[in-house]
Amino acid sequence: MNKNMKITGAGWTTSPLFIPAQKDAAIGFIGSLNYVPSIDTNENKMFKDSYLKNFGRVPSEFAVQGYDAGKVIIEAVKSLSGNITDKSQLTEAINNISVVGPRGPLTIDRNSNNVIQNIYIFEVIKGDTMPSLKILDTIEAVKDPGTGCSL
């Protein structure tokens, strides 16, 4: 990094998966992701603590995507009282689910079948033992333009 110029790019460049290898070289990077471990909510604290206990490392954006996908599916199945034989009913149930997970609120966009979610702008800063991701701004309820999947 350069003291006079910040480096920016895709958030996964400094994902929690890569920070242990990058160490202090990542400090100063600015990026955006749908999840950073420093989100200050009870849902994220519980998720992060449990993940760290079970896997010995800080969760990444990929870990939270799997967790939230499972949460959406569970809620959709519950809403159908476990009867998931009709795929169109299950799809409709998923489209009607709104959950709050470690990364914040999310729903499925009926037009694109993509997730409507917060995006976090962050900077990598020096942490106690490892660099961490400090949230600079939150862009709420980001929606895909609708040019994607047409399931």
Question: Residue ranges of each PLM-predicted region?
Answer:
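Extracytosolic ligand-binding ectodomains
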Residues: M1-L151
